[in-house]
Amino acid sequence: MVTQILTKMFGTKHDREMKKIQPTVDRINALEPQMAALTDDQLKAKTPEFQERLKKGETVHDILPEAFAVCREASKRVLGMRHYDVQLIGGYVLNRGNIAEMRTGEGKTLVATLPVYLNALTGRGVHVVTVNDYLVRRDAEHMGRLYGWLGLTTGIIVHGLTDQQRKQMYACDITYCTNNELGFDYLRDNMKFDLNDYVQRPHYYAIVDECDSILVDEARTPLIISGPAESSTDKYYAVNQIIPHLKRDVHFTMEEKSKTASLTDAGNAKVEELMGLSNLYDPQNIEILHHVYQGLKAHYLYRLDVEYMIKDGEIVIVDEFTGRLMPGRRWSDGLHQAIEAKEGVEVKSENQTLATITFQNYFRMYEKLSGMTGTADTEAVEFKKIYNLEVNVIPTNRPIQRKDQEDVVYKSEKAKFKAITADIKERMAKGQPILVGTESIEKSEALSAFLRKEGVKHEVLNAKHHEREAEIIAQAGRKGAVTIATNMAGRGTDIMLGGNADMLAKAQVGNDDSPEFAEAVQKIKPQVEAERAEVRSVGGLYIIGTERHESRRIDNQLRGRSGRQGDPGESRFYLSLEDKLMRIFNGERIQKIMEMLNIPEDEPITAKMVTNAIEGAQRKVEGHNFDIRKNLMEYDSVMNAQRNAIYGMRRKVLEGQEIERTTLDWLGDVVSNLLDTHIPEGGKKEEWSLEGLNNSLAQSFGFKIDFATMAVNTETVTDAVKSGVKEVWERQKNSMGPFFEQVQKMILLQSIDHHWKNHLYVIDKLKEGISLRGYAQKDPLIEYKKEAFKAFETLNNTIKSDAIEKVMRVQLVAQQNEQEVLESLRPEEADLDELDYSSPSEADIGHSIPETSEDAPKRKMTFQSGPRDDRPMNREERRRMDKDTKGKR
């Protein structure tokens, strides 16, 4: 009550924010006549003028009103579009580094041009990030005309570009790109051996379109680049054979909500019997237990045509948020292989992580970050806590006319489909367009079959028909059109009442660059306008939701497709007690109420109580998912600090400045460690190991000390070691001559990359088992931090000792020139395009790292340190490492 009174008196937080921005909007509007009076050349000349002012010390905030006014005027002349006042507000919010929540149809793409133009004037590069290649190309092509007219360059980053092309695109003033490509380019850059090969510049400013999808939905799964590990796939087939013999609730239990499975005592015994094992929990059998759990999940939680499809003999993931196919992406941790075994397709080998980052940590690298979406306010707390981004709700240009009806709930899915069909027929009869949203491909196909049986003409938009996505969604607002779409397929394309004249013209003439296209558009426009008026008169676009999503935000996005720019519209959700969300939360309670009231199967419940119960369930799921993402960030923050340290170390080596100083620092650390290990300070002489010290010196530096001829004490031993090491260093330096620094550089990079890769394997294994610490009343996160810190200390020492050993022992072969030496030392780079890339809703791909070419330079260097090399660990070495890691724990 008090809150309501205060809100009436002072307005909401968003109202107060808008009032603060209004004076700036007034200043921009006051400049409009002045800008309109300029010639084209005078308006274009404003860009170099602004750039010069920024160089002289003005800030982007100082020139904001003028720059926005210039951009608005240029947009009128080039695009024929003028920014409304609410769009100026949106641009201001984005420039401030916040999230602008703008309703569907309010022109987010046009809004972005204001802060993009302003910040691109700095010359530091602006990234406009969106969810797929189609939107990247569409927006860059459309808005690139405006930026080009104003003298700025525009680039695009999409799948399939070469490194040279990517570098050129990132060098542009403005770059449109997808979130996945951005993240993978960052990881790939940090796997390269020459700074000139890096494609990205330092991260200055990013505007993330559909930021709720990218920064929230996709934040649960990290981006991973991986290569194949040496491991047999036979175990997947073996485990898959026993899964049908295990009975639910007898041998195992399944938790749909958390997607977990666990064996009962009877299940343990059954698996041991079927696999011929004496004890499933013996250390050597733990891997089999893990694969049994993954097999159970594959059979009972992952469904064909819902979570994945089979295409060309491969398992292809279906994105749970957009319903799109994700070719080339794989689930990790053996789950993808378990599904391959289940479906009888070829099982591809597991992968080893080579580089990884989460979107949470990637986007926090930007100096300034902002986002825009139609639905962000429900996740405002998360945006603030994780990204330090405020959400500002931007008012609509015209009042929203859409009517959102109460949910209706049926006992069965069949009864629900019948009711939906009846509603569709009634609306079609009066010419109202209908968009039906489904949660999965399976549901869209089932409803489509039901409508076909009833003779209802319709279009289906899901991952199976994604090629026609923009065309189908753009015409979903035509008179009497019925479109079934999975979830948020077609997001980013407005549904225009009466249809889209450009799309209709393109369908007629094909090429939108031809003169015939412009003529066709002019002919079609009057009929589109007439049809639009007709559709408005019958209520506008009608949205039918066939199931509530786990997130209220996704439901709001579906509703938001209707009622754009003040158009009329309506929405309603049809639910059944068989729906996933209803089944997991509150379904039994509502079913009891229906039975108590003796409600027939084909009669629905429409009550506020039901809607509230569903929204309560959604809030629980949202809270659970937020906890997962927060937990992921807490774990990844440990990895992020380590990644930054290693990438920083790597970059310092690549820059090549004071490379000798770096090597000498490492040399000092290695020698100190040797002395601390074998003759610890303050230790008794009886505890010293002079023999061990000599063995280490022989291995790392190729010399031994004759302790029999000297008075042995801490000072004399230390001096002898330092003297011997210095002598070896000078000898190496003299023998290598002018390119000793390049040799050091290559060896240091070799060691960093090889041991970082192995460290990632250790961390992966640590994550897998750390949750078990909870059974010992220990906090898994604290334990993880401790273990990861220890592992990183070991990594640091190992990198340095390995690199120093090679630098101090490397020898030239006679007549070997500088280039041959450097080529022999340069690590054999895997083709980065052939590695495996996994991203949210996905994981590792089943390509392989190419074998070394026969024409590649042969190694001509000799390492007296013995048979150490830079290959990945084999399976036996991994087992030993796992054993050592467990022993340390």
Curated annotation (Swiss-Prot):
One of its GO terms (molecular function) is ATP binding. Residues 823-889 are annotated as: Disordered. It catalyses: ATP + H2O + cellular proteinSide 1 = ADP + phosphate + cellular proteinSide 2. It is an enzyme of class 7 (translocase). Residues 867-889 have a biased composition (Basic and acidic residues). ATP binds at Q87, G105, E106, G107, K108, T109, D494. SMART domains: SecA_DEAD, SecA_PP_bind. InterPro entries: Helicase_ATP-bd, Helicase_C-like, P-loop_NTPase, SecA, SecA_CS, SecA_DEAD, SecA_motor_DEAD, SecA_preprotein_X-link_dom. It is a peripheral membrane protein. Keywords: ATP-binding, Cell inner membrane, Cell membrane, Cytoplasm, Membrane, Nucleotide-binding, Protein transport, Translocase, Translocation, Transport. It comes from the Bacteria. Its main location: membrane. One of its GO terms (cellular component) is cytosol. It is found in: Cell inner membrane; Cytoplasm. Its EC number is 7.4.2.8. SUPFAM superfamilies: Helical scaffold and wing domains of SecA (SSF81886), P-loop containing nucleoside triphosphate hydrolases (SSF52540), Pre-protein crosslinking domain of SecA (SSF81767). Pfam families: P-loop_SecA, SecA_DEAD, SecA_PP_bind, SecA_SW. GO terms for biological process: intracellular protein transmembrane transport; protein import; protein targeting; protein transport by the Sec complex. Monomer and homodimer. Part of the essential Sec protein translocation apparatus which comprises SecA, SecYEG and auxiliary proteins SecDF-YajC and YidC. Belongs to the SecA family. Part of the Sec protein translocase complex. Interacts with the SecYEG preprotein conducting channel. Has a central role in coupling the hydrolysis of ATP to the transfer of proteins into and across the cell membrane, serving as an ATP-driven molecular motor driving the stepwise translocation of polypeptide chains across the membrane. NCBIfam families: PRK12904.1 (NF009538), secA (TIGR00963). PANTHER family: CHLOROPLAST PROTEIN-TRANSPORTING ATPASE, SECA INNER MEMBRANE COMPONENT OF SEC PROTEIN SECRETION SYSTEM. This is Protein translocase subunit SecA. It comes from Bdellovibrio bacteriovorus (strain ATCC 15356 / DSM 50701 / NCIMB 9529 / HD100). The lineage of its organism: Bacteria, Pseudomonadati, Bdellovibrionota, Bdellovibrionia, Bdellovibrionales.
